[in-house]
Amino acid sequence: MSLPEAYQLEIQALNKQVLQTCPSDILQFCADFFNSRLATERAASISLFRDRGTPSPRFPPSPTNPHFGMMSSQFSSPFGANANPFGGSSSNPNPFGGSASPMSSSVMHRVVEEDESDNHLAPGGSLFSGAFGGDASTEAPPTLRAPPTTDSYPAQYNFSRRTSVSAESLKPSADGFDNWTPPYTDKTPEQVERLKYAIEGNFLFSHLDDEQSAQILGALVEKPIPARGIKVISQGDAGDYFYVVERGSFDVYVNDCGFIEPGPDGLGNKVGTIQAGGSFGELALMYNAPRAATIISAEGSCTLWALDRVTFRRILMESTFARRRMYENFLEEVPILSSLTPYERSKISDALETQKFAPGDVIIHEGDPGHSFYLLESGEAAAFKGEEQVLSYKKGDFFGELALLNDAPRAASVIATSDVKVATLGKNAFQRLLGPVEGLLRRTRYLGVKTGVEEMDPLHTQ
């Protein structure tokens, strides 16, 4: 049994388009091709009936969608929400109300002409035998079909088949699947001091600890500016670098329109000059916002140090993720918090604040009200009742956890015996995150809430 000639012609036309276009998504391409052919044929049929002054025929639903009906060429295709991934836009409106056909307008025009002059029956041609052959007036007028309403379509009729998303990849390496290390550029001690001075007053760096600051300073890359008049950043461009001026000066220009215009005055008005030790472009470390000004070197032999947004955020993320894991491990060892779920421990870890103490500094005073709980991140400390040392603390130890239960005065003082860094959490912050501690204690029937609790913490009043 041979295939119908009309079918062979359609397949040949499809093969020709595939060879010319080489689409990456063959199913989408074929669907667009046949939908376009169907729309072209039916649009031509409707136009023919309109020219003859006869009512348009009632087309049957598409075999691929029972809700698919047409009265004109302007209807909504299930692919209408997508841009055509196989070619540019066509000058002719797409009868599917969305993406352009994979065929160019000239190909579409040629297909229409071929259809009009072709003696072979196209797919669905038998449906119009009464209209195309003989006297249409001798037959009963075809039944008209009202345009379909949006309620008749499936809920996701125009749902996008595919969506592309692009973003910067920021995955912590502490999970063990990435060996990323921060970039590092050698600098002299004098350069490090100048750079540290330049960033210490910037709000983006004010919350960094010593380790993060050292990584940020090490990641700065030198950018020599050899001549005067070199444009470092342009107003309106997307920002992705933060700059610190080590040597030289840079003029700042702002155009009220928000971008550089052609002409001698296109830079706008000069609003200031950035000298050595200054910085600019810090907003680029948070998001790629358009530059608010144009920066141009005001002299030759200038030196800049640059830091890109991805490195900055990756350094913060790596250190923050590692510190959170450390805090969570510490919190697992606190008896009063043993009933917390991993999610609750994670919330507390994010709320902990870091404090530093030099050797000999008093962390808490005997007799003071207890408002905070402490985790020892690094260093060593000792607890004293009067002049007598009663306990010593090392990395990972904790003290003052009963401050989460009540505000009883401290029973002892804790003094740093070396450089100490502690993570602290107040009772108010704890209750704001997880509610009253008493509820957590009830979950594990924590013994000692009313009796024997003083044995849990040497800093509790005897």
UniProtKB/Swiss-Prot annotation:
Region ranges (Dimerization and phosphorylation): 54-203
Q: Name one GO cellular component term.
A: nucleus
**Assigned keywords, A-Z:** cAMP, cAMP-binding, Nucleotide-binding, Phosphoprotein, Repeat
The family database entries (Gene3D superfamilies) matched by this protein are listed as:
Jelly Rolls
Modification Phosphoserine occurs at: 164
Task: Tell me which CDD domains the record gives.
Answer: CAP_ED (cd00038), DD_R_ScPKA-like (cd12098)
Q: Which residues bind 3',5'-cyclic AMP 1?
A: 204-333
Q: Which residues bind 3',5'-cyclic AMP 2?
A: 336-453
| Gene Ontology MF terms in the entry | cAMP binding; cAMP-dependent protein kinase inhibitor activity; protein kinase A catalytic subunit binding
**SMART domains listed in its UniProt record:** cNMP (SM00100), RIIa (SM00394)
Compositional bias (Low complexity):
80-102
Spell out the residue ranges making up region: Disordered: 79-157
One Pfam family per UniProt: cNMP_binding
Domain of life the protein comes from: Eukaryota
PROSITE patterns per the record?
Answer: CNMP_BINDING_1, CNMP_BINDING_2, CNMP_BINDING_3
On subunit structure and binding partners, the annotation says: Tetramer, composed of 2 regulatory (R) and 2 catalytic (C) subunits. In the presence of cAMP it dissociates into 2 active monomeric C subunits and an R dimer.
Q: Record's family?
A: Belongs to the cAMP-dependent kinase regulatory chain family.
Name recorded for this polypeptide: cAMP-dependent protein kinase regulatory subunit
